[in-house]
From Swiss-Prot:
Its main location: membrane. Residues 270-517 are annotated as: LT domain. The active site is at E314. InterPro entries: Lysozyme-like_dom_sf, MltF, Solute-binding_3/MltF_N, Transglyc_AS, Transglycosylase_SLT_dom_1. The N-terminal domain does not have lytic activity and probably modulates enzymatic activity. The C-terminal domain is the catalytic active domain. Residues 1-32 form the signal peptide. This is Membrane-bound lytic murein transglycosylase F. It is an enzyme of class 4 (lyase). It comes from Enterobacter sp. (strain 638). One of its GO terms (cellular component) is cell outer membrane. Keywords: Cell outer membrane, Cell wall biogenesis/degradation, Lyase, Membrane, Signal. Murein-degrading enzyme that degrades murein glycan strands and insoluble, high-molecular weight murein sacculi, with the concomitant formation of a 1,6-anhydromuramoyl product. Lytic transglycosylases (LTs) play an integral role in the metabolism of the peptidoglycan (PG) sacculus. Their lytic action creates space within the PG sacculus to allow for its expansion as well as for the insertion of various structures such as secretion systems and flagella. Pfam families: SBP_bac_3, SLT. It is a peripheral membrane protein.
């Protein structure tokens, strides 16, 4: 996944020109006939989105997501409340615009020429490519030419349908596919994971997030090059909303807020390691349950799952772990650090976790106050790994090379430079293995994402099992000993095949010749 960087100078110029052209309708709040005035009068910004880790996601009662945070800040910018509507698929999103049930769509949607004919795109803030995925162990397709509607299913309204049509017309005449009129991309990825589908197509960022929890999903083919992601709003003569969106993104860039959000949600990208992720998730099932109470006990204001991810990166949750340099235990503490924290046994799980948590808190307290709150943890982790002094050197080097020393995105790019002699000779604290600190922090972020997503999946499975159990009638001991002549389970199948047919009612897929969008 490659970030699509906005030409903010161009956006600024376009914003000014557009504002000048729209001067009769600005200030936006003065006239009831324009979109901004209508939003102000209503007192809420109506945004439709999709439920996904990147766009909008409920994690333990807290809503997170790149598009959610951007939409919330845009609502604040307009001085109104945010009203979010979550839809199941992309077609339903555009239906909301068509039916005037939404002011804009913020859902990681890709810009293309077909969509721009009917809807107004906003600025682009990252990019994705569309990819065919399959399940590890299944048959991997080697070319698009072999795919047919018995194998490949895509979500309704998906931008890739236009690309598939073009490929069919120009290159692969036998290419065909199904469109499931109900299920979104995430649900189709689940079906591939569960071996109910052979292949589907999703964007590279969605796949990257999904693989952190389900490593058995693998990329088979690239369908497209990088495509810009944007918001969409209604397309008509009233351009006040699109002008406001342009101005908002321009101000977000100038303040550095957009860069921080991109780093928060997109900065952990990189090559996916199937073996490492699978090993981690197996350890979550087999080892973490014994350690989780300790992580929860000593995490304090740190997310316990982040503390657990740090420990896995340090020791793979091995209390007896010892490195060639002499650091030991679950949190791999040095002897001097352990003594300063009053620890007597670094291989004792509770002592190691409590000591590591306190040491990390100390590092966070030392991070300069100018660093944004949500990024302080990454600076602290770099200091935890290579030492606080070298973290200060990395900040100083960032400032000298015209970067922002308070931006983790800028600082982490300079970390590998700390091992280059022409540069570290000019730094206060000299040589450091900055490339290791970079990998250290990035790995922890990936483990945290995997852990959060995996635990959420397990909670959903438990909830689903309870709902299924509650749907069956309760049988008393008396009824067991004196069964009625009429079965209390009237829908029990008469054969194994019949059971499958009755208990797996799957909505039919529809083969389409021409997608609606």
């Amino acid at each position: 996944m490659k970030k699509f960087k906005i030409n903010y100078l161009l956006i600024g110029i376009v914003t000014l020109l557009l504002a000048a052209a729209l001067w009769p309708s600005i200030p936006w709040f003065g006239k009831a006939e324009n979109r901004i005035a209508a939003i102000q009068s209503r007192g809420e910004l109506r945004v439709s989105t999709l439920d996904s880790p990147l766009t909008y996601n409920n994690v333990n009662g807290k809503i997170i997501g790149l598009d959610y945070e951007l939409a919330q800040q845009f609502a604040d910018y307009l001085g109104v409340k945010l009203k979010i509507t979550v839809r199941q698929n992309i077609s339903q999103l555009f239906d909301d615009l068509d039916n005037d049930d939404a002011d804009l769509l913020a859902a990681g949607l890709v810009y293309n020429s077909e969509r721009s004919k009917n809807y107004q795109p906003g600025p682009t803030y990252y990019s994705v490519s569309q990819q065919v995925v399959y399940r590890v162990g299944g048959v991997r397709p080697r070319t698009m030419a072999t795919l047919n509607d018995q194998q490949l299913t895509v979500a309704p309204g998906h931008v890739v349908i236009d690309d598939l049509r073009a490929l069919k017309e120009k290159k692969y005449p036998d290419l065909s596919w199904k469109v499931d009129e109900k299920l979104g991309t995430t649900a189709l990825l689940e079906q591939v994971k569960d071996k109910k589908l052979a292949y589907t197509i999703a964007d590279s960022v969605a796949i990257s997030f999904f693989q952190r929890v389900h490593p058995e999903i693998a990329v088979a083919l690239d369908v497209t090059d990088e495509q810009p992601v944007t918001w969409f709003s209604p397309l008509d003569d009233d351009q006040t909303l699109s002008a406001a969106i342009l101005d908002f993104f321009n101000s977000m860039n100038e303040e550095g807020t957009l860069a921080r959000l991109e780093e928060k949600y997109l900065g952990h990208g990189g090559d996916f390691d199937y073996v490492d992720t699978r090993s981690f998730l197996r350890a979550v099932d087999s080892v973490l349950p014994d350690l989780q109470p300790l992580f929860e006990k000593y995490a304090e204001e740190i997310d316990w799952r982040l503390l657990a991810a740090i420990s896995y990166q340090e020791s793979h949750w091995d209390a007896q772990a010892t490195s060639p340099t002499g650091v030991r235990g679950l949190m791999m503490l040095t002897k001097n650090t352990a003594q300063s924290l009053g620890l007597t046994d670094r291989t004792d799980a509770e002592q190691s976790i409590s000591g590591g948590a306190r040491y990390l808190q100390d590092m966070m307290a030392k991070v300069p106050d100018t660093v944004p709150e949500e990024e302080r943890i990454w600076f602290a982790l770099a200091a935890y790994n290579m030492g606080y002094a070298h973290m200060l050197d990395a900040r100083a080097l960032t400032a000298k090379t015209k970067g922002n020393p308070d931006s983790w995105s800028d600082v982490k790019q300079r970390l590998p430079l700390l091992s280059q002699k022409p540069l570290y000779n000019k730094l206060t604290y000299g040589y450091a293995r900055g490339h290791e600190a970079y990998a250290y922090v990035e790995n922890i972020r990936k483990y945290q994402i995997s852990l959060v997503g995996y635990l959420m999946e397990k909670e959903k499975e438990v909830t689903k099992a309870k709902q299924i159990a509650q749907s069956y009638p309760v049988v008393s001991p008396h009824e067991l000993n004196h069964p009625a002549t009429t079965s209390i389970l009237p829908f029990v199948a008469f054969s194994a095949d019949g059971a499958f047919e009755r208990n797996h009612l799957i909505a039919p897929n529809t083969l389409v010749q021409a997608p609606r969008r």
